[in-house]
Amino acid sequence: SNNEVCYPATLIVGDIVKAFKSGRYDPANTCVAITQTGGQCRASNYISLIKKALIENGYTNTPVVSLAFGSGIENEQSGFKVNWLKVLPIILASVLYSDCIAKFYYAAVVREKERGQAARLRDLYLDTAQPIIQKNKPEDLLSYSYLAARDFNKICEQRSCHKVGIVGEIFLKFNPFAQKDVTSWLINQKIEVIPPLISDFFMQGFVNLKVRQNQHLQRKLTPDFVIDWLYKKVQKQINKVNEIGKSFNYFIPFESIFE
């Protein structure tokens, strides 16, 4: 790598090549997909970087797809179309579900009665979610969130713990290797980690849009009432998750991105 490719991009592109070299994936029957925000970052060149890395390693027939809303960064591929209206509800439910499980896990792992209980529950509920997501049943994820809250309660001892939040660049916050596994170190010190939330990364788009429009940095392509309606729909789902989360004794609710 060099100073033209950021550290997260180096790791992500390297992981993709490493996955193919492991032999677990057939390059001829595999597609590489990555989300794109189009932000002012060298990682916005992910598509070209991934293509270059795959070609240089001999994987010339593996298509690379960009999952993006913005124009000019989609890298469209024939045979690959996303019905966003159909998949957005399950995407939202999946993001909130994973964030909810993270909240349960990090609060429980420093209070578990027996070592390993929290990790087993985390893995169980993440594995349980996979077929539900494939069947596109967002309401079922809400039901399993409630069951998870109940089960995480059962493994916890009543204990007060110091709390530490993880902040910073998005990839470093979520990838243990990238942040030298600081979360595990904190857990071993019996410090409760306040996990980063992937939902906040997407919810900030509502704030960013309003700021850019108010500062006349972006045209109003969509009426305000449409954006407000969409935000209320999303917030309604968040409120449902907060109600379910209350069943867990150490649950910290999702907050409004505007507060």
At which residue positions do the language-model features occur?
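An N-terminal assembly and electron-transfer interface module characteristic of large anaerobic redox
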Residues: 1-259
